[in-house]
């Protein structure tokens, strides 16, 4: 499989065409961004860590029957994935009050929720990826009612699998963002990534943060935090 021309470059990844019409080549970048791109930095090794962690977690999800776009890891920073049409929604699942939910509800971070909350954000950088209701989603033609229901169900199932796996590593899954795509066959599958860039991950006992909040809030060394998550998951030798 060959990497051909660049199709798209985002904040954290580059996507390239391959000679296979139904596959694309993803390269993880060493860039870190926060606050819709207002804060930026280059952090050596971050691309490798996100690729390793995403590869590990996508394989875990595939093992329990959750379909993803992931095909195989190609190098320290690259993956081969199925080509999908991305649904323009970020699906955020929350288990504990933190981040924007804390500000929006005026509640302290760290309070566990009685049951997970699923939120939808419209993917539009110019609008700042706003929180949207199901009615808004229909007005935007971002997804059908049936697709919204499917996204919610998939997010909650993935949440349960990840909660259990991170708990076995002494990590609390506070919240996380997912993206989904539609294959050529019309199936909705998990796409994008699952990494400390897209999850809030706290130590089970100390609540030390091992995620992008380390960068957002200047809490320490980002690569050390991500390395800790990879180590607890089993390390690169298992990925």
Curated annotation (Swiss-Prot):
PROSITE patterns named among the record's database cross-references: SAICAR_SYNTHETASE_1, SAICAR_SYNTHETASE_2
InterPro entries (alphabetical): SAICAR_synt/ADE2_N, SAICAR_synt_PurC, SAICAR_synth, SAICAR_synthetase, SAICAR_synthetase_CS
Catalytic activity: 5-amino-1-(5-phospho-D-ribosyl)imidazole-4-carboxylate + L-aspartate + ATP = (2S)-2-[5-amino-1-(5-phospho-beta-D-ribosyl)imidazole-4-carboxamido]succinate + ADP + phosphate + 2 H(+)
Transmembrane segments: none
GO BP annotation list: 'de novo' IMP biosynthetic process; cobalamin biosynthetic process
Alphabetized UniProt keyword annotations: ATP-binding, Ligase, Nucleotide-binding, Purine biosynthesis
Similarity remark: Belongs to the SAICAR synthetase family.
Protein name per its UniProtKB record: Phosphoribosylaminoimidazole-succinocarboxamide synthase
Organism: Bacillus cytotoxicus (strain DSM 22905 / CIP 110041 / 391-98 / NVH 391-98)
Source taxonomy: Bacteria, Bacillati, Bacillota, Bacilli, Bacillales
Gene: purC
